[in-house]
Amino acid sequence: MMRDSPSIQGTLDAATQHALLAGRHADPFSVLGPHQAGAHTVVRVLAPGARTVMAVLPGGQRTPLLPMQPGLFENTVPGLQPGAPAAYRLCIEWEGGIQHTADPYAFGPVLDTAQLDHCAAGGWRYLAGLLGAHAASVDGCAGTRFALWAPNARRVAVVGDFNGWDGRRHAMRLRYPAGVWELFLPDVGPGARYKFQVLGADGHTVLKADPLARQAEAPPATASIVPDERPFAWTDEAWMEQRAARQRCDAPISIYEVHAGSWFDDAGAPRWQSLAARLPEYARSLGFTHIELLPVMAHPFGGSWGYQPLGLFAPAAAHGAPADFAHFVDRCHEAGLGVILDWVPAHFPDDAHGLARLDGTPLYEHADPHEGRHPDWNTLIYNYGRREVRAFLIASAIHWLRHYHVDGLRVDAVASMLYRDYSRPAGQWIPNRHGGRENLEAIDFLRELNAAVGVQCPGAITVAEESTAWPGVTAPVANGGLGFDYKWNMGWMHDTLRYMRRDPIHRRHHHHDLSFGMVYAYAERFVLPLSHDEVVHGKGSLLGKMPGERAAQLAQLRLYYAFMWAHPGKKLLFMGGEFGQQGEWNHDAMLQWSLLDDPAHRGLQRLVADLNHVYATLPELHCRDADPSGFAWIVGDDADNSVLAFARVDASHCLVAVCNFTPVPRPGYRFGVPHAGDWRVRVDTGATRYGGAGGGPPICLRSEPIPAHGHPQSLVLDLPGFTALYLRHSE
């Protein structure tokens, strides 16, 4: 054991020594590490709590560094050549043992200057590879490179398991003018927990998680984790090659929306591993084409369901390691399923360890709460006018799509981004530079985002949750649109659910709620969403929205699903809806799988599977989703009987959907059809295989030359109550 070294006065003035030991010195590389002093090289080391420090040359020569003050060591090192950064190592004696390491302050700048300049100009291309924690080898020394954008900070240090969370030990170098602080720490590897200690422009010292961390602790812990950067062994080459064709507007897209934490409880098994073993095969067996996950990004509060994330580059640790999430995506692709993630660039929570006032200023958010705080969620709003913030968000999106092979992003709360007065009364919002309510900076950001995804991630899609009539959400950026591939049809969802909640005796007065959606069905490329938002906050379940006794509720839900699957637009159904979950969704409990012991609920699940199969295999139900020629009303005005009939067509096929939204049978109901000949029943929601009473029409019907509804041919049948029929023309 080495003895404590005698103290010396040293070559640093008292003020500098005090600033170092107090954790206030902003430029550690100017005083720590090797420095030329005349013909000699002086080495200084800041190691509070160390008993002794020695500089060890490659040949084994040892030079004790002498303490100027407890924790601050210095000495001339004979034989050390200036400008040879890796030419010595440190041997540090701590109370608990000996540490051998290279000196972090012996290395020059580690970030590429050209890439830094690109990021400083608002470029996102190199951002995820520059900032955060990355494995690196510098001058033959392995370790981790840390970097943080904090341009207004007075000082930044990286703290963690490797330095006892002592902010004095590893202060970082500022790369001006990019505003990025960097430090290479030798011998720090995957699994190490860390944060950044930031002395802000406001004079306050705070601990911040890494905004670009690719791995994080599970809440309530808040540290970032140095990730394991070994590449994942993907097996989805075939899927990735076919992805673009599977996600086009003329392809069948049926999305199963899932909250990873409550789909199934597998007795404490790691969530992604458990889901990978069960969920892809389940969704595939029901005919879904995609799984959409509520946000999987690291978030501090589970009750937010992920919609208040702080780790925009890290999968939530509660479900497993990043590699486990990659495995889940790979298994989905193996099962022929795409993966869409909900992604939240609209706002972020103000937790102390997060982005809020990261460098002592409103860096990621607006300074004025009329712009920077969201009145609905009490969260902070990104400053889209700042190029570095736009780059941060776009880099996050590209990271999920490229690093994790994700197939699409559903962008949350787009309406709140587009309007400066969203949820704000008069006098509580700031107009744009033209005096209007449009958020011009957010518009530019969304266009830039979608353009970047299109170039960098061919075949990937973006979907907007946009609840207003903003024009051109899915129009190309070049044509003045926002550039999304699809938009949730919130209007269709609200209108039709409002209709279905009504007592059937009153539905005749609200027939337009079912038909109005076709007025604007081709204004955008739409997804019809029955999402998690419709089964929370006292809204009850989808089944619970249907009036009447349980048998009537199930019959109406079957009818509603058949109407939806025949209607133009891609499909989305939240988990539990496929078998008629009775209770409102609870994120703290798994789905009511026991309901599948009931034949009626199994029948509903079977119907969803059959609807998906028919939708995917009959081209007229999907290939002209974005083309008005693919739809024609047959019976759109029979409000008295609450009956709708319409045709879905392509160049060679025709399917007619007939829906009776009352419990009253309609015997001898006649409606026109576009073609003469035989029409086969492809779906009958009242069939016994779906839990219905049966008694529907025969499997094949022949048209009669009796004009009806503008067609020279017609069909006549007994239309049961609460029933939808799909009739396909036989060639």
Swiss-Prot record:
Pfam family, one: CBM_48
Regions annotated as coiled coil: none
InterPro entries: A-amylase/branching_C, Branching_enzy, GlgB, GlgB_N, GlgB_N_E_set_prok, Glyco_hydro_13_cat_dom, Glyco_hydro_13_N, Glyco_hydro_b
Record keywords, A-Z: Carbohydrate metabolism, Glycogen biosynthesis, Glycogen metabolism, Glycosyltransferase, Transferase
Pathway annotation from the record: Glycan biosynthesis; glycogen biosynthesis
EC number of this enzyme: 2.4.1.18
UniProt keyword annotation of Transferase present: yes
Reactions mediated catalytically: Transfers a segment of a (1->4)-alpha-D-glucan chain to a primary hydroxy group in a similar glucan chain
Gene Ontology BP terms: glycogen biosynthetic process
Matching CDD domains: AmyAc_Glg_BE, E_set_GBE_prok_N
Gene3D superfamilies, per database record: Glycosidases, Golgi alpha-mannosidase II, Immunoglobulins
Subunit structure and binding partners: Monomer.
Similarity comment text for this entry: Belongs to the glycosyl hydrolase 13 family. GlgB subfamily.
PANTHER family: 1,4-ALPHA-GLUCAN-BRANCHING ENZYME
Cited function: Catalyzes the formation of the alpha-1,6-glucosidic linkages in glycogen by scission of a 1,4-alpha-linked oligosaccharide from growing alpha-1,4-glucan chains and the subsequent attachment of the oligosaccharide to the alpha-1,6 position.
UniProt name for this protein: 1,4-alpha-glucan branching enzyme GlgB
Gene that encodes the chain: glgB
